[in-house]
């Protein structure tokens, strides 16, 4: 009897699939295309389904006016869905909109990083 199991074998994938089932929520990572535009088509529906949207504007750091246009589009999407936008970095180039029924801890986290003094030992 071998004490190690190859978790890549199909039998383990089948067992895991039976226990867990299909994912109901998804993460959508969006960044500007080659023409520096954001394709946000259908994202309002995805947010209403409870999906998470992360927008990376880091490729536009040399284009502040285009970055601002994209930020306004993200803000409009957030207003239409009634959800807040969170900046995940100090440069405000990594933005997040948490979908319906998602909770974001704004007390123990600053810019997406837990502050060690506020974490409990439980």
Language-model features, listed with the residues they occupy:
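N-terminal intrinsically disordered, cationic/polar leader segments
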Residues: 1-42, 46-49
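Short acidic, S/G/P-rich loop/turn micro-motifs used as interaction or catalytic elements
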Residues: 35, 59-64, 103-104
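Long, contiguous hydrophobic alpha-helical segments, chiefly transmembrane helices and signal peptides
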Residues: 53-57, 67-74, 95-97
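Helix-rich interaction surfaces within compact, conserved domain-sized segments
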Residues: 2-11, 77-122
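Short glycine-rich, basic-tinged beta-strand/loop micro-motifs
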Residues: 47-61
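N-terminal start-of-chain detector that recognizes signal peptides
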Residues: 2, 24-27, 57-58, 66-70
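Structured extramembrane domains adjacent to transmembrane segments
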Residues: 36-44, 57, 94-99
């Amino acid at each position: 009897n071998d004490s190690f199991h190859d978790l890549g074998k199909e039998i383990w994938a089948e067992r895991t699939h039976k226990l867990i089932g299909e994912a109901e929520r998804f993460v959508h990572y969006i960044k500007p295309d080659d023409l520096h535009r954001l394709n946000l088509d259908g994202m309002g529906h995805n947010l209403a389904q409870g999906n998470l949207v992360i927008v990376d504007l880091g490729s536009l750091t040399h284009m502040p006016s285009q970055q601002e246009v994209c930020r306004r589009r993200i803000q409009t999407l957030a207003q239409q869905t009634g959800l807040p936008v969170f900046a995940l970095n100090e440069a405000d180039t990594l933005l997040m909109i948490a979908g319906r029924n998602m909770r974001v801890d704004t007390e123990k986290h600053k810019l997406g990083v837990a502050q060690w003094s506020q974490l409990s030992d439980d």
